[in-house]
């Protein structure tokens, strides 16, 4: 039986969504610079005839696949929205208007009004920042190695909080808020362990991304912010940072179970619906 798959070729990761033999939605993930592994996997799936591809590296991958498959290309923002809408329905959310923050290699932020999306903005701070700083500061360069260390790390010896500055005096804002990411490293000599450094890197990224998302949400008086992206996958530390900061500003954070695969899901659904 001929089949269709969706591919989201991102800056760092390439995600694949397809229906297995039991018609269950299934995912695969590869590093985007490992194109040989992607092609080898595709060759083993002999039933695949059509691929809907999206993402920043879609053109590069498409050039390698166009002779073997029927290729449909889809704008990555459209694919992501289709995927997010599908996941929201599957997870029983009834939300039409929200801010969508996609934390990939960098971070893009959109306003979503029903099935219409408007780009609000973005930042170069994202998953690529986490991995770049992790490599520079600890020489750890695999996301899978960063996550477990981050879980046991602490930011208290590296970040300066509002409470640190006010020193017990009543402050105008919450003492636990970060006044300066990595600020203590400039004034306190210490051999910081990798866990604390990695936790602080994620704190920096999480707070920058959340602050920007909150500003956009507040501008349009939107109450829900949906955070997606592979950077959040199994990353409880980063999710907790984002969640607590979002709630502090009286907005509702939502993390979708398969949010990191939303682009690939959207590509699959688009091609499947178009085919039918």
From Swiss-Prot:
It comes from the Bacteria. It is found in: Cytoplasm. Its EC number is 2.7.1.33. The keyword Cytoplasm applies. ATP binds at residues 8-15, 105, 127-131, 143, 230. SUPFAM superfamilies: Actin-like ATPase domain. It catalyses: (R)-pantothenate + ATP = (R)-4'-phosphopantothenate + ADP + H(+). It holds the Pfam family Fumble. GO terms for molecular function: ATP binding; pantothenate kinase activity. GO terms for cellular component: cytosol. CDD domains: ASKHA_NBD_PanK-II_bac. Pathway: Cofactor biosynthesis; coenzyme A biosynthesis; CoA from (R)-pantothenate: step 1/5. GO terms for biological process: coenzyme A biosynthetic process. Homodimer. Catalyzes the phosphorylation of pantothenate (Pan), the first step in CoA biosynthesis. Belongs to the type II pantothenate kinase family. This is Type II pantothenate kinase. It comes from Bacillus cereus (strain AH820).
